[in-house]
Amino acid sequence: MGIEGVLDKGFVTTSLDSLINWGRTGSMWPMTFGLACCAVEMMQTGASRYDLDRFGIVFRPSPRQSDVMIVAGTLCNKMAPALRKVYDQMAEPRWVISMGSCANGGGYYHYSYSVVRGCDRIVPVDIYVPGCPPTAEALLYGIIQLQNKIKRTNTIAR
């Protein structure tokens, strides 16, 4: 957090932007949107070995309780409207992590008639995590990159 100054009486001064962004990075609640084998790696990231709870990250089942969506796996044309509907139900500010080659660009099924060639055609994506399937460490790195991106944003319009 960008502490601007510490005064004699024990007060700390900082900007409101850095305080709000610090709170947002410390309490990200992702919603799982597991569509294929990448979801298994996403579950492993939330388990005891990597323990996302230490970062304040708690998986939520409802889009109304989440601010991060992790799209993991192959997105088919039939599932695309459901993805958009769930994204629209999330409260602002909201972020999207695209996990795996299939979610990033269609992956192995890129030339199939029924596969969306990247979930960024349906929802805006903030972080892309490559791999087929990406490891739990790669997803953890993507989450940390999203936290860094949130820290750099301006919250209050000037």
Curated annotation (Swiss-Prot):
One of its GO terms (biological process) is electron transport coupled proton transport. One of its GO terms (cellular component) is plasma membrane. Gene3D superfamilies: 3.40.50.12280. It is a peripheral membrane protein. Transmembrane segments: none annotated. [4Fe-4S] cluster binds at C37, C38, C102, C132. Its EC number is 7.1.1.-. Keywords: 4Fe-4S, Cell inner membrane, Cell membrane, Iron, Iron-sulfur, Membrane, Metal-binding, NAD, Quinone, Translocase, Transport, Ubiquinone. It catalyses: a quinone + NADH + 5 H(+)(in) = a quinol + NAD(+) + 4 H(+)(out). It comes from the Bacteria. GO terms for molecular function: 4 iron, 4 sulfur cluster binding; iron ion binding; NADH dehydrogenase (ubiquinone) activity; NADH:ubiquinone reductase (non-electrogenic) activity; quinone binding. It is found in: Cell inner membrane. Binds 1 [4Fe-4S] cluster. Its cofactor is [4Fe-4S] cluster. NDH-1 is composed of 14 different subunits. Subunits NuoB, C, D, E, F, and G constitute the peripheral sector of the complex. NDH-1 shuttles electrons from NADH, via FMN and iron-sulfur (Fe-S) centers, to quinones in the respiratory chain. Couples the redox reaction to proton translocation (for every two electrons transferred, four hydrogen ions are translocated across the cytoplasmic membrane), and thus conserves the redox energy in a proton gradient. Belongs to the complex I 20 kDa subunit family. HAMAP family: NDH1_NuoB. This is NADH-quinone oxidoreductase subunit B. The lineage of its organism: Bacteria, Pseudomonadati, Pseudomonadota, Betaproteobacteria, Nitrosomonadales.
